[in-house]
Curated annotation (Swiss-Prot):
Residues that bear Alanine amide: A23
Localization of this protein: Secreted
Role description: Antimicrobial peptide with activity against both Gram-positive and Gram-negative bacteria. Has been tested against X.axonopodis pv. glycines (MIC<2 uM), E.coli ATCC 25922 (MIC=6 uM), S.aureus ATCC 29313 (MIC=6 uM) and P.aeruginosa ATCC 27853 (MIC=50 uM).
The protein's name in its UniProt record: Pseudin-B
GO cellular component, one term: extracellular region
Predominant place of localization: secreted
GO biological process assignments: defense response to Gram-negative bacterium; defense response to Gram-positive bacterium; innate immune response; killing of cells of another organism
UniProt KW keywords: Amidation, Amphibian defense peptide, Antibiotic, Antimicrobial, Immunity, Innate immunity, Secreted
Length: 23
């Protein structure tokens, strides 16, 4: 459902933050 989608999006944002920090 939407809650799962929101969690996935939040997870992607966290991954993007980590990638940006290591870039």
């Amino acid at each position: 459902g939407l809650n799962t989608l929101k969690k996935v999006i939040q997870g992607l944002h966290e991954v993007i933050k980590l990638v940006n920090n290591h870039a």
